[in-house]
Amino acid sequence: VIDDLKTEARKLGLWNMFLAKGHYKESPGFTNLEYGLIAEQLGKSRTASEAVNCAAPDTGNMEVLAKYGNDAQKKQWLQPLLDGHIRSAFLMTEPDVASSDATNIQLSMKKEGNDYILNGQVSTDLVGRGWH
């Protein structure tokens, strides 16, 4: 059923509505206010956000990839997310802090040459299990 809803959403131009046209040429081009009102209605259904490819955490992750991702990251991760073929995750649950607040993360990052070294620990991953 969800695949049929996704097909219909694409036909109606209701796909990836949260992204600006600068990041996604097929975007309906809603303002943040307009999309906020739409998101309020989508939130009344357990499946609506996924049916129009506007479900968290994918929306935020797609925005980050669209704005900051390099070409290889966009090809490997952004395009499949935009197409609705994969789901993503945002992991922030750490064992020593109440990390439902993304600003409370203990993870550290340092630059070494052209690379960034991440040092941290995620205690569990419950995102995306059983979605399909």
What does each of the following model-derived ranges do?
Residues V1, K21, M92-E94:
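Intrinsic structural disorder
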Residues D3-K75, Q79-G84, D125-G130:
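Internal helix-loop-helix
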Residues P28, Y68-H132:
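Glycine-rich, Trp-frequent "lid" loop and neighboring beta-strands that shape
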